[in-house]
């Protein structure tokens, strides 16, 4: 089974990379208020760059949550099976 590498960075810290098989986070709406909301990323996802709004971030491995937290606004990128999240803040729950 393919896995993702999740990297979370804030201006104050960079968390150690985490191995997971899915990530859920909150996307910003576009200028007309469309398209935002919860978004899921799985292995094999296409290359992407996304604007994030404040909200929850969840990472799962084999269907079990392994990381739950609250993100500040920022960006997420997907390249290969690496998800990089750069946000104003991140607080584990």
Q: What role is predicted for each listed range?
A:
Residues 9-93:
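Compact, glycine-rich, soluble single-domain proteins
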Residues 2-6:
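Short structural boundary motif marking the start of a folded domain
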């Amino acid at each position: 089974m393919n896995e993702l590498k999740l990297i979370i960075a804030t201006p104050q810290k960079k968390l150690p990379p985490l191995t997971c098989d899915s990530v859920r986070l909150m996307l910003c709406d576009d200028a007309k208020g469309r398209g935002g909301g919860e978004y899921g990323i799985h292995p094999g996802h296409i290359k992407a760059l996304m604007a994030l709004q404040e909200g929850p971030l969840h990472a799962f491995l084999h269907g079990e949550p392994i990381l739950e937290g609250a993100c500040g606004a920022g960006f997420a990128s997907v390249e290969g099976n690496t998800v990089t999240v750069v946000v104003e803040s991140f607080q584990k729950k």
